[in-house]
A protein has these predicted regions:
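Contiguous, well-ordered beta-strand patches that form the walls/edges
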Residues: 38-43, 58-116
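Broad, structure-driven detector of short, well-ordered beta-strand segments within folded domains
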Residues: 45-51
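Bacterial Sec-dependent N-terminal signal peptides
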Residues: 1-25
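Short, low-complexity, Pro/Ser/Thr/Gly-rich segments in the mature regions of secreted, periplasmic
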Residues: 125-133
Length: 134
């Protein structure tokens, strides 16, 4: 009956949320994103990708100053134990953006991606939504 349909659709929705989306390095290459959730009153945040670098940017409204933080990355289908620098710049497909921060593996899970938006869940447990700029 109706209840079964609700349960099934709920299970389907939950599985959609839990299953990460796959992306290729070549698809991220050359893209630019603006953070839309969370938002900040005092700054605008964003990120850009090349084949081997993910650069996060913070632009402060008051001063107009922009700070960029470029970090090497690679795409992986799982979270690695150690950072494999030989994978940087290679076109791979997977659900995780892998970076090396403070001598350890830092990761973002690609929870959702469309032609206009990307949702990332970080190792620290926070979720960030970006809108595509180009």
């Amino acid at each position: 009956g109706m209840r079964n349909i609700l349960v099934i659709s709920l299970v389907f929705l939950l599985s959609m949320v839990c299953h990460a989306q796959k992306i290729a390095t070549s698809e991220l290459n050359g893209t630019k994103w603006k953070e839309i959730s969370p938002t900040y009153d005092y700054c605008e945040r964003g990120m850009t990708f090349t084949m081997d670098t993910r650069t996060t940017s913070t632009k402060f409204y008051k001063t107009g100053k922009e700070f960029n933080c470029p970090l090497k990355y690679y795409i992986s289908s799982s979270i690695p134990e150690t950072f494999d620098s030989s994978q940087i710049g290679k076109s791979r497909k997977g659900s995780y953006i892998i970076q090396y921060v403070d001598n350890s593996v830092f990761w973002f899970k690609i929870v959702d991606i469309s032609s206009t938006k990307i949702t990332l869940l970080s190792k620290l447990g926070d979720t960030t939504v970006y809108q595509k700029v180009k």
